[in-house]
């Protein structure tokens, strides 16, 4: 028995997977039986000290002979800061706050820029498998690859006969990754979190062949903030997605997120948050505020960050930290860049959940009257004229039967304004942004989806980020799209090669004849038209910059 156990352990050690990096270093990963994983590989120098808030610097140390068998730490996280806990019963609250996406992610460190590669068992260099590069979500405030396990997707790809390699890149969030303000603009350090992602893509281009991946077959995909990040990489450098003369990616998948409705790095709100952050960190009177911030402790910066509003605060989707036009890599407002055709021309999938706004509507339950709703919208959308606010409120009336969660009649109106505000927030940030993108993007084949899988769920409906449950943890009709169809798209640039029971139609415009959406519900898949809430679309998208934050 002891001999058999010893031989088993020897065989296990001998079976540990290896990969050779572009610089000649050989690293060892973890044999997880159903897959092989290389976890926590550094791709950038620690962004600490003088590198804090700055562009990432490629990692220059030797990794030869090292083992990468566990995830690296999460980047520093902001407290999402909810105000609704005492106002709402436990049913919906538990659903939101106990989900992995909204739980605190530990351990945390500023030294966090690592990348994870998971491949089918037995994959060797030369296999040239398609690569799916995941960008996690979390409102640009929280998140980590550790809460989005790729095992289900990689295993399904093997069962489908379309094996892929899954890569997940860590990136700085909150103040560490998306601090704005005049000082940041002057230094050219804006959007550091996006630059982390971009450097991770370059690492993949240089090294993935040594793991058995094909650097010419990379699909970038993400959810929520990750989805918006994918859009940012489509328009990065006015659409130039090349590195060393070759494209960094050949396709994109966006799950709940497109253009970020944001003012420039040196805009009014970015400076307001910067001033609050600097003051909270004790650097308000410093002659060189950034130098002061770079000398502060991590705990000091964490406290200062948590003193700014999170996405579950009253200000909700008026986020403190998010990608902003910087005049360098994101050269203009994102809607204009898409409208002007300044994007990488690649095939895309983009889709939404039917009730994207309900989570964010929970933070304004003290808004109960029509007058208070108007004041809330005026405070949230400082660029909108009185006439534009009037048009918005007419398109999204107080009538609870028209609000979100949609198609629920008089039910789920936990306040007279909850369903109304939820509808506006969900449509602005997700639903109508997706439709705007699809109506203007002409860079490649387009597919779109809309899920109503949880339409019977009280208060929340088919809420934002529920797709992660089906993508990473459970099976069901959603999983067929978020796994099988996405894998087929990454492999063949056509989701229909997954053998879907319903043909997924191509999307040309929201007014095209015939169906243009793949619809998901609890019973299965069907197709539909992207022609709902047109008055809301017109109110929000006729002049999108009026609703920038």
UniProtKB/Swiss-Prot annotation:
**Quick one: a GO biological-process term for this protein?**
lipid catabolic process
Spell out where the chain is glycosylated.
329, 366
Cited CDD domains: Esterase_lipase
Tell me which positions the record assigns to the signal sequence: 1-15
Q: Which InterPro entries match?
A: AB_hydrolase_fold, CarbesteraseB, Carboxylesterase_B_AS, Carboxylesterase_B_CS, Type-B_Carboxylest/Lipase
Alphabetically ordered keywords of this record: Cholesterol metabolism, Disulfide bond, Glycoprotein, Hydrolase, Lipid degradation, Lipid metabolism, Signal, Steroid metabolism, Sterol metabolism
The domain of life is: Eukaryota
Tell me its family: Belongs to the type-B carboxylesterase/lipase family.
This protein is called Lipase 3
The source organism is Diutina rugosa (Yeast)
Upper taxonomic classification of the species? Eukaryota, Fungi, Dikarya, Ascomycota, Saccharomycotina
